[in-house]
Amino acid sequence: MIASWYDGQGPAADVLRGGELPDPRPGPGEVRVRVTVSGVNPGDTKKRGGWLGSSMPYPRVIPHSDAAGVVDAVGSGVDARRVGQRVWVYGAQSYRAFGTAAQYTVVPDQQAVPLPDHLGDELGASLGIPGITAHRAVFADGPVDGRIVLVHGVLGGVGSLAAQLAHWGGATVIGTVRRGGDLDRVDPAVVPHTVALDCGDPASAIRAHAPDGVHRVVEVSLSANADLDNAVTALDAVVAAYGTHADRTELPFWPLLFHNVTLRLLGSDDFPAAAKRQAARDLTAAAAVGALTVDIGDRFPLADIAEAHDRVDAGGRGRVLVTVPG
């Protein structure tokens, strides 16, 4: 198969290689997926770059955990009728060496999720890490029907999906963006109230839409927003944080304690397997009824995977995808 891989960590152009590797074979309980589109996440580029001193977990790594494609072979114990089924894939390179930046990837059966016929491969390849993280942030502490959910970074990959999932789940969503110039990019049908963090007094602006406080916070930068979250959370609220800018974060401990606020930290590789499966079911169901859309940014052929990684590292709008040749 044609694939891209790295045998050591470093800058994308220095370590990513392309060529042919043996076709993988599915083992018991596994399926092989013929990949059409591979999704690139910040975690993929951080692993490749040795972020936070991480080392190579395997001698050779095919990067990327997310993808869409077609099941073309199954291992023992898997229903043979899965062959030919369109799927979206999550976790392909989570505690596994060979991910989705290749013509074929092998994953446990349940990590190849049936993709409804009317949904495109680009959407499917965009659901894995950001979608499952968003789902966990919104629903880990129970249903949100009738609740107020504050989503920081509502235009981001996780934030956008979190807002859409919360809306699908019956919540009223308040979103934040960094600058007032971004306000008109937010869909008011999903996020009826959006606050720009540069407005001067974002806490008062949020409180204007939630006088008794917000019940859930989906947090993209705990170190930057800890004081703001403290100012707007309701009694027994949950702050679910999947990111931060500073490794060490100061918290307004006593005010949060007196409000019985729960702080939940989210690392998607280690979510419970049952939670991932439920997230996959809900993401597919929401997407099937048109409740989820994804902003697609740049697309790169597999041969240009280093450019795709550099694009993710540089930041910018939209999901970065790699198309895999047939």
Each model region followed by its residue ranges:
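NAD(P)H dinucleotide-binding glycine-rich loop of Rossmann-like/cofactor-binding domains
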Residues: 80, 90-153
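Glycine-rich phosphate-binding loop and adjacent beta-alpha segment
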Residues: 224-291, 324-326
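Short glycine/proline-centered loop/turn elements that form peptide/ligand docking sites
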Residues: 76-77, 175-185, 198, 221-226, ...
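C-terminal capping/lid region of NAD(P)-dependent oxidoreductase domains
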Residues: 291-295, 306-326
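NAD(P)H cofactor-binding loop motif with strongest signal on the N-terminal glycine-rich segment
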Residues: 153-154, 221, 244
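Glycine-rich beta-strand-centered segment in the early N-terminal region that forms part
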Residues: 22-40, 51-93
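Short amphipathic alpha-helix with an adjacent loop that forms part of the alpha/beta core around
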Residues: 201-212
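Mid-domain Rossmann-like dinucleotide-binding core that forms the NAD(H)/NADP(H) cofactor-binding site
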Residues: 125-199
